[in-house]
């Protein structure tokens, strides 16, 4: 990504959040237009005068001046943010009110309010994540569509419908209200899905989207900076993200191929992120609620503390999966538990655990279900069965990297002699 593109993506969310607070969420399109105008002016100006020492401040000032111009010109013709209306109606209070919205504290507050607005209960879950990516992370419609393997025109319609839903509320979510705790789980879920899209993504270019993982971590840090949203569950989610992000440098080999956890070069794991994850996990211990994020973070933490794959405490991991199944039973969690059982007790026990999964039909389109079956059969020296499962996984692979990995496992089947 070009430096300017990276900067614009980084600043887009902040600017859209600030301007939406000023204009009102019903004028979201206007806020986006002002941001786009600021970026266009930057490209034109910087081309001749060079990039300023503080490009972020330059963009903020440009957007602020444009916002003031619009508010002065259309103050009586258009309805702006209801909660700022009395300040925006007078020239004496207009400039100070706008200036206040561009302060650091107001920017952070605006980003949080926008995040909570994006998970409006009438917006479908996958669209909530797409909306966060689009509005708060600066991803264009085409980029957002690519992240979810959707067509750009379909994603544009989906985002458009979600924006109309937000517009009907006329104002951003109020963080001082009593429904923060009610909507926070949806925010955490959206960030979890965003990170997951990066970590287990199906991009045509890469099986890993570190940029999506980084955005999920950045937005989670905003939650931890606000006392109303810095809950134990938010700390647990931050811990999970840190532990998993620490492994990203080893998740692909130098050729860009997927590397399984057991074969990763653990010396390349990010020790600072692992330490940060431990601090967040400690912070998640407050309170008396045990969430799936706590258990997933604890599992990832056990992997992170194992210096070698053979040092992994699989018994403890199976125990954590057992607890996870009691509060969030799903076929995918059950499959992960089966993999842990296979590591603890051997592949035959792993196959037995898979056979006991409730509603296995929900895994029928999940490539890693067949990949796990193939791995277990290969370890049991049954290459014929393994080959069938790997072929089924290959047919469902979502990216060239996944296909390449599974093709490699198919080739490995030829090197295994059938058990007698």
Regions found by a protein language model. Give the residues of each.
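Σ70-family region 2.3-2.4 aromatic/basic alpha-helix that recognizes the −10 promoter
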Residues: 36-40, 53-82
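Short, small-hydrophobic-rich alpha-helical interface motif
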Residues: 31-42, 62, 162, 216
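Short, charged helix-capping/linker segments at alpha-helix termini
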Residues: 1-6, 16-35, 45-53, 151-153, ...
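Structural motif corresponding to the intra-repeat A-B loop/turn of tetratricopeptide repeats
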Residues: 245, 308-311, 344-345, 380, ...
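Amphipathic helix-loop-helix modules that constitute alpha-helical solenoid scaffolds
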Residues: 74, 82-126, 132-143, 150-322
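Residues within the DNA-recognition helix of helix-turn-helix
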Residues: 11, 158, 389
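"A position-specific structural signal for the A-helix of alpha-solenoid helical repeats
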Residues: 237, 241-244, 296, 300, ...
């Amino acid at each position: 990504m070009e430096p300017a593109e990276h900067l614009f993506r980084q600043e887009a969310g902040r600017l859209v959040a600030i301007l939406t607070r000023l204009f009102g969420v019903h004028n979201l399109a206007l806020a986006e237009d002002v941001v786009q105008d600021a970026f266009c002016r930057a490209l034109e100006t910087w081309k001749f005068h060079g990039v300023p020492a503080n490009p972020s401040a330059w963009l903020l000032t440009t957007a602020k001046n444009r916002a003031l111009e619009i508010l002065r010109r259309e103050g009586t013709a258009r309805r702006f943010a209801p909660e700022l209306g009395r300040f925006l109606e007078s020239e004496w209070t207009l400039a100070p009110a706008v200036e206040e919205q561009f302060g650091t504290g107001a920017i952070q507050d605006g980003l949080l309010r926008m995040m909570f607005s994006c998970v409006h209960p009438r917006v479908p879950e996958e669209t909530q994540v797409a909306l966060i990516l689009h509005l708060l992370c600066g991803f264009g419609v085409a980029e957002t569509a690519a992240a979810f393997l959707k067509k750009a025109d379909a994603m544009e319609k989906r985002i458009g419908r979600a924006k109309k839903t937000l517009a009907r509320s006329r104002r951003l979510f109020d963080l001082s209200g009593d429904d923060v705790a009610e909507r926070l789980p949806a925010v955490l879920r959206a960030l979890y899905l965003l990170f997951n899209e990066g970590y287990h993504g199906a991009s045509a270019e890469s099986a890993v989207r570190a940029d999506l993982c980084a955005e999920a971590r950045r937005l989670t840090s905003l939650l931890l900076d606000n006392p109303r949203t810095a809950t134990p569950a938010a700390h647990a989610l931050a811990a999970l993200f840190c532990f998993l992000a620490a492994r990203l440098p080893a998740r692909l080999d130098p050729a860009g191929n997927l590397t399984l956890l057991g074969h990763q070069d653990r010396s390349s794991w990010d020790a600072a992120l692992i330490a940060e994850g431990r601090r967040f996990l400690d912070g998640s211990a407050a309170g008396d609620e045990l969430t799936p994020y706590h258990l997933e973070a604890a599992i990832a933490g056990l992997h992170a503390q194992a210096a070698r794959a053979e040092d992994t405490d699989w018994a403890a991991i199976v125990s954590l999966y057992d607890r996870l199944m009691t509060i969030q039973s799903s076929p995918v969690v059950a499959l992960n538990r089966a993999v842990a059982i296979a590591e603890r007790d051997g592949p035959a026990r792993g196959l037995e655990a898979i056979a006991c999964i409730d509603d296995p039909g929900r895994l029928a389109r999940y490539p890693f279900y067949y990949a796990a079956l193939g791995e277990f059969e290969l370890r049991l020296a049954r290459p014929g069965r393994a080959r069938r499962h790997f072929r089924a996984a290959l047919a469902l692979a979502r990216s060239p990297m996944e296909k390449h990995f599974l093709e490699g496992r198919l080739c490995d089947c030829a090197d295994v002699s059938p058990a007698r």
